[in-house]
Design a protein with these regions (language model features):
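Terminal, non-globular segments
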Residues: 1-170
Length: 170
């Protein structure tokens, strides 16, 4: 049995903003120096850049990156550059990625998430910081594993009911 093909409603811009706020609040949690915690802002940013590239672009990515830089007290622009590159590459592949299943989409998104985590590391290494270690490589994998869940949650308000409602005019 195949999954039904859903006809999606237009996305509400308030819901997009709400999803970014919730992802940012997740990133604000006091994890300490734990490197394997997924970057939910990056995951939500890739999702909206793939599904709604005209509503969420590189400007939003840059602004969110600056917010993350201020939160992490890092060099101003580390996350901004990483998120801008992430948005650019996600918008570049968005038409191709949408043709695949959710699990294959996760495999397509995984290199983008690795790039997003590698850019701040390269910037810090150029500034003379030590190499952070292997747990940093786990975070993009966890984010890719969260891709099907993020897709289900973030597309849920747009999905129409599969059951026919007799009282609905359209």
């Amino acid at each position: 049995m195949t999954n039904p093909q859903y006809l999606l409603r237009p996305v509400n811009p308030v819901f997009i903003a709400f999803s970014f706020v919730m992802a940012f609040l997740f990133n604000l949690m006091p994890w300490g120096t734990t490197l394997w915690i997924p970057d939910m802002v990056a995951l939500v940013l890739v999702f909206w850049n793939i599904h709604q590239p005209r509503k969420v672009g590189m400007g939003v990515a840059f602004a969110l990156g600056l917010l993350m830089d201020v939160h992490d007290a890092r060099l101003l622009g580390e996350h901004a550059v990483a998120y801008t590159l992430l948005a650019y590459f996600a918008i570049t592949i968005h038409r191709r990625v949408l043709w695949f299943t959710v699990y294959t989409q996760a495999l397509h998104v995984l290199p983008l998430l690795f790039i997003a985590h590698a850019v701040p590391v390269v910037i810090r290494l150029a500034m003379g910081a030590p190499l952070p270690g292997w747990p940093l490589l786990v975070a993009p994998g966890i984010e890719a594993l969260l891709w099907p869940l993020a897709t289900a949650v973030l597309l849920a308000p747009q999905r129409r009911s599969v059951d026919v409602d007799e009282t609905r005019p359209i």
